[in-house]
A protein has these predicted regions:
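Membrane-interface interhelical linkers
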Residues: 2, 6, 10-43, 47-93, ...
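Hydrophobic transmembrane alpha-helices of multi-pass small-molecule transport proteins
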Residues: 67-72, 127-132, 143-161, 287-304
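Hydrophobic/small/kink-forming positions within alpha-helical transmembrane segments
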Residues: 42, 46, 73, 95-103, ...
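Specific alpha-helical transmembrane segments that line the substrate/conduction pathway
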Residues: 93-99, 106-156, 202-208, 258-278
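Hydrophobic alpha-helical transmembrane segments in multi-pass integral membrane proteins
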Residues: 72-81, 129-144, 182-199, 242-258, ...
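Residue-level signature of the transmembrane alpha-helical core
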Residues: 35, 39, 66, 92-96, ...
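Alpha-helical transmembrane segments of multi-pass integral membrane proteins
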Residues: 125, 155, 172-189, 212, ...
Length: 305
């Protein structure tokens, strides 16, 4: 995998190919970017899960991804680079699977199965890159890092699971599982983008995802975007945080392995839970509290390892 650094500000993160002492600085910075990514995903998920109850999931998906296109179009102007054709292809494939994943997850939310959709998608999306990094890429995390990865996956399940009555269980479970597979594949494709590629592959990623969502929205309903102004604005805000998460994730990959960054960036359920308690007055279950603590410990172990 080509991972070289460039001279622009956003490309000034050290490459994986530099000396060992340089990597000692890189990895903590990588974890910081991964944590910023998980906060961004959590905020995006918080806004999107709420609006998906009131608006059509297809229309919410289109708006979320439209926001990503708009933000990346501006960002790419200032984030120059030297992308190869392979970088652009990986960006396009990341967009295709990401668009499908967002659509399926929002459909699961719309069916009222948030309690099982959120933990299922979160666990799968973090597990797929870990298996890929270890089994395919041959990565060998340290014992401390491996402990953090395992604890992180368990923490994801605990913090995102909600008690209470389950509705539309099996259908939501299947949709969330497939969505998690697509999100995991998105992480893998993003990891193949070179450090000096700049922002254009991520712009292509968002355009491809938007085209998928827009096509589905137009073929299944009369509108491409939510009919209410509130629904559109909320979805757009979710999209801004969503693309921020992608950018932070790619930056995190420059100093850490795919397995480590994916698990650290997948702790977004903790953010969603805290926002739900603070803003919506939702109840925090005791196991979610354990999950929040586990998430913090997992990130700490990954950083130390």
């Amino acid at each position: 995998m080509r991972k070289t650094s460039a001279g622009s500000t956003l490309n000034a993160i050290p490459s994986k190919t530099v000396a060992t002492q340089h990597n000692a600085y890189c990895v903590p910075v990588s974890v910081i970017y991964a944590v910023l990514s998980t906060f961004s995903i959590g905020l995006s998920d918080f806004f999107a899960s709420g609006v998906s109850k009131r608006e059509r999931a297809n229309e919410v998906s289109s708006t979320v991804l439209l926001a990503g296109v708009a933000v990346m179009a501006i960002t790419t102007v200032f984030w120059s680079g030297h992308p190869t054709s392979l970088d652009q292809v990986h960006g396009a494939f990341a967009g295709l699977v990401n668009g499908l994943g967002i659509l399926l997850l929002f459909l699961a939310y719309a069916r009222g199965s948030l309690r099982i959709a959120a933990p299922t998608a979160a666990v799968v999306m973090s597990t797929v890159p870990v298996l890929w990094d270890i089994l395919v890429s041959g990565s060998s995390p340290s014992t401390t890092t491996s402990t953090g990865i395992v604890l992180g996956v368990v923490a994801i399940a605990l913090s995102s699971y909600e008690g209470g009555h389950h509705v539309a269980g099996s259908g939501g479970l299947f949709l969330a599982f497939v969505a998690g597979l697509f999100f995991g594949a998105t992480f893998i494709f993003l990891s193949r983008i070179g450090n000096d590629a700049g922002g254009s592959p991520l712009l292509i990623q968002r355009i491809a995802a938007f085209l998928i969502a827009a096509l589905v929205a137009r073929s299944t309903g009369p509108r491409m975007f939510p009919k209410t102004r509130e629904g559109f604005i909320t979805s757009f805000v979710a999209g801004i945080f969503g693309i921020a998460a992608v950018v932070f994730f790619v930056l995190a990959l420059r100093g850490g392995s795919l397995a480590v960054v994916s698990v650290a960036a997948s702790q977004y359920a903790a953010v969603s839970v805290l926002l739900g308690v603070a803003i919506r007055g939702q109840r925090m279950w005791w196991w979610q509290g354990l999950g929040l603590g586990g998430s913090s410990l997992a990130v700490a172990l990954i950083a130390i390892g």
